UniProtKB/Swiss-Prot annotation:
The protein, known as: Probable protein kinase UbiB
Signal peptide start and end residues: none
Disulfide cysteine pairs (residue numbers): none
Enzyme class label: transferase
Active-site annotation: 287 (proton acceptor)
Keywords: ATP-binding, Cell inner membrane, Cell membrane, Kinase, Membrane, Nucleotide-binding, Transferase, Transmembrane, Transmembrane helix, Ubiquinone biosynthesis
Gene (UniProt): ubiB
Length: 544
């Protein structure tokens, strides 16, 4: 490692130990090497013993920067994996990260827009409405019509922090991939690369604006999801202005109950919104932590989600979607043979994998899980158990699906917070079955025909010319193949001649040696000369 990377690594370890985070790893679970490493850093002691463990974890992640804050945000949504004393403090990372100075934010916005804020806005609030790991949000009113808006600005000097941590993550990922064969199958370098891409995408607010516009168009007039309007005239790389929304934060359970919200329908709509984005639109919001999700307070009996912060989105191609849908349905139906075969067909495990053994392994993992009521099943635990099983069969995690997995965990975590009895499987199953029905059969064929017909009609006038060119190329190809074959035959003949001459030459040279021993010098000299000549001719034949 380079000195700068070693320094950053030491900084990470130092912060974690000074906040007493080694308590998260009980000593009886540690091997000798980590124990020795901890004892060797004896001067690094818990400096915040007066604070609870969850608060110490939150403060440590916040001190380490945006890469770590993002990790904490995901942990906070997994209340089925982490106890409340961990998840509750981490929830503050979603929109309560320590803000930077509001006057500095105003100055940054004015520099980017090229004029004083008063040119376009009134009532700019120096105090931020929300402060997150990447950006900070302030409120104002449009001078032209008095409309309430929010101004989002990227934190200053954040790029060097992210670059340093990502470099270190690459270094560690490469070391782990070389040292641990099991980790290599999980493609740690590719996972870090995907994570880097998502973080860097968040640093360009033009991308977020485009994503928000796309998502808003996808759910236009929808009762399930509302996306605020982006004011594109005021958007650039580090500043974005959008409509201000008024809603109840999805994590404010008391507020939702007080408003009379239908919690069951709200949780089910979260699952529906996720699967609609993935399978209908192939474009999904991939940062659905509670800080980015609000609920429309109007019509609480028919609740509507409000999605903010579209900096991270994911896309899937048709093959990925079909594979995922078939896998989900196979799980729902406990068709473990189908699950195993799909893994082989998709290339996630080697083609020579024993499907029977793989099926048995999956069954052993899933059957105890399905023994519980469906509403108690955690998809997070299913994924963890499946990964442990798949490692035995050399499964490679596909980096392009990492965002999807993370988003599904977010959605499940939110749904279970809103309605603990949420049956994720039964909520999603009808949606997936309907989607699969639209992908196969006569209806799907007619839909594909209708979709492609305009392109076919457009290309039809070109068919005669394309056919003529194909026939001409085919004739030329046949001629070239014939020439290659004749050249090959000529080469084989020359090689045969070369081998024959080499053998004759070798025989004559051996004979010349025998004749010399019998004192027949003239005959030996002639034989040797002819033998050498045969070798030269043989060499020439090979060269040709």
């Amino acid at each position: 490692m380079k000195p700068a990377e070693l320094k950053r690594l030491y900084r990470i370890v130092k912060v974690q130990l000074e906040y007493g985070l080694d308590e998260l790893l009980p000593e009886h679970h540690l091997t000798r090497a980590p124990l020795l490493a901890r004892k060797s850093l004896f001067w690094l002691r818990n400096q915040h013993a007066d604070k609870a463990l969850g608060d110490r974890l939150r403060l440590a992640l916040q001190e380490l920067g945006p890469v770590w804050i993002k990790f904490g945000q995901m942990m906070s949504t997994r209340r089925d994996l982490f106890p409340p004393y961990i998840a509750d403090p981490l929830a503050m990372l979603q929109d309560k990260v320590a803000p930077f100075d509001g006057l500095q934010a105003k100055q940054l916005i004015e520099e980017e827009l090229g004029a004083p804020l008063e040119t376009w806005f009134d009532d700019f609030d120096i105090k931020p409405l929300a402060s997150a790991s990447i950006a900070q949000v302030h409120t104002a009113k449009l001078k032209s019509n008095g409309r309430d808006v929010v101004l989002k600005v990227i934190r200053p000097d954040i790029r060097p922090q992210i670059d340093a941590d990502i470099k270190l993550m690459y270094r560690v990922a490469r070391i782990v991939a070389k040292a641990l064969p099991e980790a290599r199958r999980l493609k740690p370098v590719e996972v870090v690369r995907e994570y880097e891409k998502t973080l860097l995408d968040e640093l360009d607010l033009r991308r977020e604006a485009a994503n928000a516009i796309q998502l808003r168009r996808n759910f236009e007039n929808s009762e399930e999801l509302y996306v605020p309007e982006v004011l594109t005239d005021f958007c650039n790389e580090t500043v974005m202005v959008s409509e201000r929304i008024y809603g109840i934060q999805v994590s404010d359970l008391a507020g939702l109950h007080a408003n009379g919200t239908n919690m069951k329908l709200l949780a089910e709509r979260g699952v529906s919104v996720f699967f609609t984005q993935v399978f209908r639109d192939s474009f999904f919001h991939a940062d659905m932590h509670p800080g980015n999700v609000f609920v429309n307070p109007n019509h609480p009996e028919n609740p509507q989600w409000i999605g903010l912060d579209c900096g991270i989105v994911g896309t899937l191609n048709s093959e990925d979607k079909r594979y995922l849908a078939e896998n989900f349905l196979a799980f729902f139906n406990r068709d473990y043979r189908r699950v195993a075969q799909l893994h082989v067909d998709s290339g996630w495990v080697p083609l020579d994998t024993n499907v029977d053994e793989f099926e048995v392994a999956i069954r052993m993992v899933c059957e105890p899980i399905f023994a519980k009521p469906l509403c108690e099943i955690s998809f997070g635990h299913v994924l963890l158990n499946l990964f442990n099983t798949a490692r035995r069969f050399n499964m490679e995690v596909q980096p392009q699906l990492v965002l999807l997995q993370k988003t599904l965990l977010y959605v499940e975590g939110l749904g279970r917070q809103l309605y603990p009895q949420l049956d994720l499987w039964q909520t999603a199953k009808p949606f997936l079955e309907k989607w699969m029905a639209n992908q196969v059969g006569p209806q799907a064929f007619l839909h594909a025909l209708k979709e492609r017909a305009p392109l076919w009609f457009e290309k039809m006038p070109e068919l005669p010319e394309l056919l003529y060119d194909s026939l001409k190329q085919g004739r030329n190809l046949n001629q070239r193949l014939d020439n290659l074959y004749q050249g090959y035959r000529q080469s084989k003949r020359q090689q045969g001649t070369g081998k024959f001459l080499f053998g004759v030459g070798a025989t004559l040279v051996v004979c010349s040696a025998i004749w010399i021993s019998n004192q027949l010098e003239p005959l030996a000299i002639g034989s040797a000369t002819i033998g050498v000549l045969c070798w030269l001719l043989s060499w020439r034949a090979y060269r040709q």
